[in-house]
From Swiss-Prot:
Keywords: Ribonucleoprotein, Ribosomal protein. This is Large ribosomal subunit protein bL28. The gene is rpmB. SUPFAM superfamilies: L28p-like (SSF143800). GO terms for molecular function: structural constituent of ribosome. GO terms for biological process: translation. GO terms for cellular component: cytosolic large ribosomal subunit. InterPro entries: Ribosomal_bL28, Ribosomal_bL28/bL31-like_sf, Ribosomal_bL28_bact-type, Ribosomal_bL28_sf. Pfam families: Ribosomal_L28 (PF00830). NCBIfam families: L28 (TIGR00009). Belongs to the bacterial ribosomal protein bL28 family.
Length: 78
């Protein structure tokens, strides 16, 4: 399973660890992903999405029905 938020599209990015001597070693910054069940009142069922913390805030703001319709328009499975 890829580390991508289904709502926002956030994915891992790369950067550097910096030591006290400012040596740079490559590292990955991972999104804060969670598998979360959301109740969809219109379908009378739970839907499980892999979302970041920001994705959960987007769902709180827009509503789960709006977000699911956007996912359907993109052709993403949930």
């Amino acid at each position: 399973m890829s580390r991508v938020c289904q709502v926002t599209g956030k994915r891992p990015v790369t950067g550097n660890n910096r030591s006290h001597a400012l040596n740079a070693t490559k590292r990955r910054f991972l999104p804060n992903l969670h598998s979360h069940r959301f109740w969809v009142e219109s379908e009378k069922r739970f839907v499980t999405l892999r979302v970041s913390a920001k994705g959960m805030r987007v769902i709180d703001k827009k509503g789960i029905d709006t977000v699911l319709s956007e996912l359907r328009a993109r052709g993403e499975k949930y």
